[in-house]
Design a protein with these regions (language model features):
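Conserved metal-binding segment of the jelly-roll/cupin
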Residues: 86-88, 114-116, 120-134, 138-141
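A short hydrophobic beta-strand segment most commonly corresponding to one strand
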Residues: 101-104, 141-153
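Residues in well-ordered beta-strands of folded domains
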Residues: 66-68, 84, 103, 138, ...
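Short solvent-exposed loop/turn micro-motifs enriched in small/polar/acidic residues
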Residues: 76-77, 104, 120, 130
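Conserved short histidine dyad/triad with adjacent acidic residue
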Residues: 63-70, 79-97, 131-132
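A short, N-terminal "cap"/entry segment at the start of jelly-roll beta-barrel domains
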Residues: 1-77
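A short beta-strand-loop-beta hairpin characteristic of the jelly-roll/cupin
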Residues: 86, 93-123
Length: 153
C-alpha cells in the first residue's frame, strides 16, 4: 500500500524527529522505529474527535492513526491498536473512555491520571490507564509519539 503523503496531517512532519529520538534509545526501539518509518505514510491519520475547533493549537498539533481495529488498516472487534503524535508544546486534554488503555512511549512526554501530578515518561517506558480514568498527555520541547492499545471487550 502506498499513500500520497500530501494527505497526511501537517503535524506528521514531526514523525521523523520522533523516530530519530527513539532510534537512539537502544536496539528494540531502533528496530521499532525502522519498521514504523516504513508504515506511517500508509496510516489513516486524523485529529481526535475530541477536537472540533480547527483553528486551535490542539487540533493542528496532534493526530491519531488506528492500525488495527475499527477504522484501521485491519479491522478487529476486540482491540484497537494505534499511535498518537503530539507536536512540541501541545497538551492532549483530559479525557476518559471505558476501555482499558496501554501506551508504549516512542518519544518522551508527560502523562497525568485522575487529579494527580504530571509524570514524565521516556522512550521505551509504558503507561497504563484503567477503564474510565481521566487522563491527559503533553509534549515538551520535542514531539511526543506513543503507540497505544485499547481493549474493547
Amino acid at each position: 500500500i502506498t499513500k500520497d503523503i500530501s494527505n497526511l496531517q501537517p503535524v506528521c512532519k514531526y514523525i521523523p524527529e520522533s523516530l530519530q529520538i527513539a532510534g537512539n534509545q537502544g536496539p528494540e526501539l531502533k528496530q521499532l522505529s525502522a519498521k514504523f518509518q516504513s508504515l506511517y505514510k500508509q496510516l489513516p491519520w486524523h485529529p481526535s474527535d475530541r477536537s472540533t475547533d480547527k483553528k486551535s493549537a490542539f487540533y493542528r498539533g496532534h493526530a491519531n492513526a488506528v492500525m488495527t481495529g475499527h477504522g484501521g488498516l485491519e479491522e478487529h472487534s476486540s482491540v484497537r491498536f494505534g499511535v498518537s503524535l503530539i507536536a512540541p508544546n501541545i497538551e492532549y486534554p483530559n479525557h476518559k473512555h471505558p476501555p482499558e488503555e496501554g501506551y508504549l512511549v516512542i518519544s518522551e512526554g508527560d502523562w497525568r491520571q485522575a487529579n494527580g501530578d504530571w509524570f514524565h515518561r521516556k522512550p521505551g517506558d509504558t503507561v497504563h490507564n484503567v477503564p474510565n480514568i481521566w487522563h491527559a498527555m503533553r509534549s515538551g520541547k520535542s514531539p511526543l509519539l506513543a503507540v497505544w492499545m485499547l481493549w474493547i471487550e
